[in-house]
C-alpha cells in the first residue's frame, strides 16, 4: 500500500530503500538515503557533490547535523535553512564535481515557486524594524 501511494505522488523516481521495511528507524532511513543518492560519502546539494569535511567545525548551525547527513542529499534542508544567498556562494569552494540526476522530482528552479517566494521573503525582511521594541513615549499622568 505504501509503495502504491508513493508511486502516485510523483515525489521521486525511485522508492526509497529501506523505507518500507520494519522497523523503520532514523538509522535505516539514513542508510537507505545514503544508498539511493550516490553521494559517495559526501554531501549532495542540487546537482553537485560537496566535501564539507573541513567546514564541519565552522558550520554556524553546529556540527551535529552536518555530520549526520554526510553521504546524503541535503538540497531541501539547505534551501529551507539558508534564506540569504551567502551560503550558496560560500559552498562553491567545497564542490567536488557535478552529480547525476536527482531521484527526487521536487524542483528548485531559479524562476520557480520556491525560489520566487524565498526572494520575496528576503526582500520583505529588509523592511522590518529589527531594533528592540521601544517603550511607549506616551505616559499617563494620573
Curated annotation (Swiss-Prot):
Belongs to the cytochrome b5 family. Keywords: Heme, Iron, Metal-binding. InterPro entries: Cyt_B5-like_heme/steroid-bd, Cyt_B5-like_heme/steroid_sf, Cyt_B5_heme-BS, Cytochrome_b5-related. Pfam families: Cyt-b5 (PF00173). Residues 16-100 form the Cytochrome b5 heme-binding domain. It comes from the Eukaryota. One of its GO terms (molecular function) is metal ion binding. SMART domains: Cyt-b5. Gene3D superfamilies: Cytochrome b5-like heme/steroid binding domain. Heme binds at residues 59, 82. GO terms for cellular component: mitochondrion. This is Cytochrome b5-related protein. May play a role in muscle cell metabolism.
